[in-house]
Amino acid sequence: MKTMVRTGYLTALLLLFGAVYFTVSAAAATYYVDSSGGNDNNAGTATSSAWKTLTKVNSVTFQPGDQIKFKKGGSWTGMLWPKGSGTSSSPIVIDSYGTGNAPLFNGNGQEATVYLYNQQYWEIKNLEIINDNGASSKRSGIYVVNENGGTLNHIYIIGNNVHDVYGNNVKDANGSSGIKVRTKAGTVQSNYNDVRIDGNTVGPRVDRTGIDLNSDFWCRPDAECTGTYNWYPSTNVVIQNNYVNDVGGDGIVPQNTSGAIVQYNTVNGFNIRSGMVNAGIWSYNADDTIIQYNEAFNGNTTLDGQGFDIDYGQSRTIMQYNYSHDNDGGFMMVTQPGTAKNDGGIVRYNISQNDGARIFQLAGPITNVQIYNNTLYLSPGQTASPIYANSWGGYPKSAAFYNNVFHLESAGTWYGLNTVANFTFNNNTIYGVHTAGEPADSNKSTANPMLVNPGSGTGRLAVDGYKLLAGSPALGTGKLIASNGGKDYWGNAVSATALPNRGAYNGAGITPSNPAVNGGLESGALSPWYGWNAASVVNSNARTGTYALRLVGGPSSAEQVIQVEPNTTYSLTGYAMTTNAGEPVHIGVKNFGGTQQFTSITGTSYTKGTVTFTTGAANTTATIYLYKPSGTATAYGDDFVVAKSPAMSADSSPE
């Protein structure tokens, strides 16, 4: 739950540069700056007559259409603050030229490395920016300010590398950031229109916020403000394609906006140094925000600490197509204090893998929240509460959960759902462990949803393990949702009339070519095999590739639960060897609806073993294994394949 302190003004920066500026020609021109070969007495209009210093650039009032290009490989210390504004048809562009590394700017402890004040129609591109002088203070990498400027337009910040901004970690609206676009209080109601923050890398070592857009024109009852109403949101804000990592506090935070879009961003590591309430990607005091196609992970706190957050002062925020994982605080928070507003939020078609503390947190008297068609997974040993509802000046008033898949191999308790005044829970799947407080659901499924390979996600575009296998009971058994967004996480159509699937996947059931995941052990890790006693993966004695499964002595085993179709015949093929011919090792299958099957291998070189089995009428899983029943010898296994019969030919070599 985040409350921004809106106090203070930036120290008057005008004094830093004096009061004398030079105006260049009215005709658009390109100016070159070379830190090693330039001279401020040059004209600056050719690479052979480049300027040299920031002092020269900062003394010029540039005209619409001008370009200021800094030589790659060059470096400058201090603040870059060129003057002037462009027009809608002719913005002023800061960029680079030449070859080599991006031009490097070090603010050296000033409040900004690159700064614009009451300026519009600017584009800042392809720079490397730091702000570090060995001591922390309130500072930013790129800082754009509107103070009594009315509506300022077209601020584009594109393709920059901002890192090592050694700001303090105080959480307030005027605090430190990698990239900050800010509207300050004044006598003229002011905002920004057409802001694009695109393709930047922010981090590592940025304190405290990665990307922040905020305003002192924030006051309205929705944000629990009882003062003079002055909310004046920025419009046409797009924050996309940015990579934010190792930030002291929050990752990406659009505040006081209307219709902002936050998409295709990655936040890797937030709240690394702050110790305050923070989240990965969240919006505040903003209407009609869309947050989609993002990934947030490695959040380092349970003070909030979710990958994503619909914070208070909001209406109609949509959170969709995002991937959250390994965040200490959880996946998703929807929150408001008692007299504020958070209404009509939608959370849909997202995937959460091993998020901590609270997968979902509902805090305060939020209203009309819809959470549907999400897939949530917890692996063994996790203790997160699947849903956690608590008071913040009142308990949640109304929330609905539909068509979600909770695949819980372990979990904490479901907390506080009896406090939600109007709580609807329908057509959800809860599979695995069933802990205290689990909500009633007249159309609940507790059957295995048959995810292709849960727990295998490695990135936003690498989560196919959360699709549904053919025969899944989650296929076509969801609830129709009006205005459902029209597509799932992978872009499959979601009909307005046909029943949807449960979970984030709405495509047809998947028939994998080999249900045995990591059958060749080439991930270098045991998962999703489960070892018992002395089982491990080693980079020696592999039949093919680099890695093999090893059992040292007996009894010991490695097992894997695979997804299968009912009433279907399969063959399991694998290769094994033992270091002592008198001590067999078994390749086998069990728990498939029939009698356990195995073949014994006693050879001291890799020998192929095959077993055939037919699943039961209701069986959707089977357990394959490599088992050494006794002895002291070491056994190895590799290249396990499960296929529908007819089995692979004898001369086939599995990949």
Predicted segments, located by residue:
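Right-handed parallel beta-helix/beta-spiral solenoid domain characteristic of secreted/periplasmic
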Residues: Q67-K69, S75, S85-S137, D164-D172, ...
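Acidic Gly/Asp/Thr-rich repetitive segments characteristic of extracellular carbohydrate-active
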Residues: S35-K71, S75, L80-W81, S472, ...
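Extracellular and organelle-lumenal recognition/adhesion modules and their flexible linkers in secreted
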Residues: I510-E655
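Predominantly extracellular beta-rich ligand-binding scaffolds that present long acidic/polar faces
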Residues: G78, K83, S89, I318-S324, ...
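Extracellular beta-strand/beta-solenoid scaffold signature
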Residues: W81, G107-Y115, A135-N148, V170-V195, ...
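Surface beta-loop-beta hairpin patches that serve as ligand-binding interfaces in beta-rich domains
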Residues: D464, L469-T511, T578, A650, ...
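Surface-exposed loop/turn segments connecting beta-strands in extracellular beta-rich domains
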Residues: G78-M79, L127, N131-N133, S137, ...
